[in-house]
Amino acid sequence: MAGEHLGVAISASFSGILRRVSTVYGTALLVQGAETLLSDRAVDARVKAARRENPQAELIKLEGREVDAGRFVEATGGSLFSQATIVVVNAVSDLDKDLFDLVTTTAANPPDTLCLILVHPGGTKGKGLLTRLSKAKVETVKVDAPKPWAIPDFIAKEARRGHLDMDHDAVNALHQALGNDLRTLAAAVDQLASDSPNGRVGAQAVTTYFG
């Protein structure tokens, strides 16, 4: 009987651990890099995960240049109207350096009801905050722009993402026509996918659209 109780207790404890690991609440994410499409997608993915977990969560978006200590504490300290809060702080590079310790402390140990997302646009501005967040081992997603030679791979992945069959020549034709801007390329792939009833496109079609 004692063994049975012990087994139940262990099972319950393990389930609790799994729930804590899988939740995005009580966590912070730093999205760092200059590629805005990838940055937006990383933020959107975390917000969607938080919303799936708690559809009633309040979403608060802040701009680094407008944040002071009082506003940050108010946003991250919990809501009177919701049991959970998603806080996105854009351009943390613009935060006053006097806030670096406060932001780092919160990111290192967020309340269980908070999903915190910090967005840094790359570059050296706000480096002191990045150093602190790194030392605090805050989860980080790097969203740097791919090298030009890696752009065809990005296009191919976008095509698969949109269930579009693009051969090698079509991928290269799109790259040559539109260059290296990821947002432009992603929009072009979306257009090709929506205008291709058979889900397949070749180099000639790409040239017709964008050549």
Descriptions of predicted regions:
Residues 2-211:
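Conserved beta/loop motifs at nucleotide-recognition and modification sites
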